[in-house]
Amino acid sequence: MLKFFAPASIGNLGVGFDVLGMAISPIDGTLLGDCLSIAPAEQFDLEIKGSFSDKLPKEPKKNIVFRCWKNFCQKIGKDVPVQMRLEKNMPVGSGLGSSACSVVAALVAMNEYCAHPLDQNALLSLMGEMEGLISGNVHYDNVAPCYLGGLQFILDTQSRISQSIPLFSDWLWVLAYPGIKISTAKARNVLPVHYSKRDCVDHGRYLAGFIHACYSQQPDLAAELMKDVIAEPYRLPMLPSFLTARQKAKEMGALATGISGSGPTLFSVCPNLKTATSISDWLQHHYLENDAGFVHICRLDSLGARSVG
């Protein structure tokens, strides 16, 4: 039996709506993401376990993992009977790429099991297609970093879907998931159809400046430019505690704070462990709403999806 892990990811990073995403891992070694095991079988079978398995459909054929298996088999032109076991350790609707974790784990497992019939670009394209079945449209800002690791800039051209961007190895990222669910589709529906010229210019300036700061290794400039004029203003009513948390994090030394993906998870970028620990402790007591919530101090995950046994 082969086992694979697909890590959590932060979509958008505030400044890059639908075009930036980064894989993330807790510094304490916790596997924040989904694990999937695969073994030979006479027919397809899926077992679902894990901390958040009760949030998924009871019928295996309604799970995205089954649809990944089915579409992968269609791509390679033959059915491959396997037994899969999904360990669902990511909360659904958390803003941490939960569906991407399942999609990436399933497709990486199938591609490895079948001796790599799909190349990286073809596999990533299929991942985006499968993610679109959950969120309502094809996008790669979670599946690309979850699969490839690091910070990914989504190009979505004919020759290349995403490009790795250098980040800052000393940055720590505090993630706080309050324990409530926000549907990605619902979070996208609150966004306007049209934006002002001012917002478009500002968005382009912030994103281009952030990419420049990453390549020129200017962390202070990069953090200053992590501003969201596209999604955050319209999603704030769904996150009533966010502004208070961001202000407190800033007072405690955070370089930047934003909404992870569609929310409700927030991230705070910290320059050192002392600051990260202080902010983590505050969020633990003031941002979490129930026992399902959690806070992790994380680093960039440069590995992406990988074999774990």
Swiss-Prot record:
It comes from the Bacteria. The keyword ATP-binding applies. InterPro entries: GHMP_kinase_C_dom, GHMP_kinase_C_sf, GHMP_kinase_N_dom, GHMP_knse_ATP-bd_CS, Homoserine_kinase, Ribosomal_Su5_D2-typ_SF, Ribsml_uS5_D2-typ_fold_subgr. Its EC number is 2.7.1.39. It catalyses: L-homoserine + ATP = O-phospho-L-homoserine + ADP + H(+). ATP binds at P91, V92, G93, S94, G95, L96, G97, S98, S99, A100, C101. It is found in: Cytoplasm. Pathway: Amino-acid biosynthesis; L-threonine biosynthesis; L-threonine from L-aspartate: step 4/5. Pfam families: GHMP_kinases_C, GHMP_kinases_N. The keyword rRNA-binding does not apply. One of its GO terms (molecular function) is homoserine kinase activity. GO terms for cellular component: cytoplasm. It is an enzyme of class 2 (transferase). Keywords: Amino-acid biosynthesis, ATP-binding, Cytoplasm, Kinase, Nucleotide-binding, Threonine biosynthesis, Transferase. GO terms for biological process: threonine biosynthetic process. Belongs to the GHMP kinase family. Homoserine kinase subfamily. Catalyzes the ATP-dependent phosphorylation of L-homoserine to L-homoserine phosphate. This is Homoserine kinase. It comes from Hamiltonella defensa subsp. Acyrthosiphon pisum (strain 5AT). The lineage of its organism: Bacteria, Pseudomonadati, Pseudomonadota, Gammaproteobacteria, Enterobacterales.
